[in-house]
């Protein structure tokens, strides 16, 4: 997630990131304390909801800072195997899961080659689709889906942990 919105697409300058090893890859991780704090809170809540099987999808939206127009929409569609309880062992080896995550990260990084250049300063937003009965933190707010009219879409690789299957896709404004 941090790779998409901030570093790879230039939403934040490269100077605001540090190179760190994660999932066996060198990744750009935010050095900005405000951004790190914000993402830390979101990711903590997301992890809780994922563990409970309450997440349907995560969407990273990149929008024009001045126009507010959605330019890219990165969708991570989550299917949870509800028959596997939180205390049950997962049959899939961690090495295999890590390999699939590496493949997705590489594909996201490579997508910069076919996505249109972002011609204006941009911001990002995170949309988390959950089950209807989930308690949402008070600081969070409802949002429209921020769809893109006349978009092109590219389906990226999927990965599975045996508990979760994640399908990935990016849609982007075709006529930028």
PLM features: what roles do these ranges have?
Residues 1-37, 45, 49-176:
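Long protein-protein interaction modules used by eukaryotic assembly/scaffold proteins
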């Amino acid at each position: 997630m941090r790779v998409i919105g901030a570093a790879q697409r230039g939403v934040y300058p490269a100077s605001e990131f540090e190179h760190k090893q994660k999932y066996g890859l060198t990744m750009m991780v935010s050095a900005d304390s405000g951004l790190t704090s914000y993402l830390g809170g979101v990711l903590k809540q997301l992890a809780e909801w994922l563990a409970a099987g309450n997440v349907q999808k995560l969407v990273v939206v990149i929008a024009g800072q001045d126009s507010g127009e959605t330019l890219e929409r990165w969708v991570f569609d989550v299917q949870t195997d509800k028959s596997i309880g939180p205390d049950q062992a997962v049959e899939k080896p961690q090495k295999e899961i890590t390999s699939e995550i590496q493949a997705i990260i590489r594909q996201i990084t490579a997508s910069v080659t076919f996505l249109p250049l972002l011609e204006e300063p941009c911001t990002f937003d995170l949309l988390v689709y959950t089950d209807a009965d989930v308690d949402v933190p008070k600081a969070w707010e409802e949002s429209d889906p921020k769809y893109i009219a006349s978009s092109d879409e590219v389906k990226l690789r999927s990965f599975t942990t045996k508990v979760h299957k994640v399908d990935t896709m990016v849609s982007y404004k075709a006529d930028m």
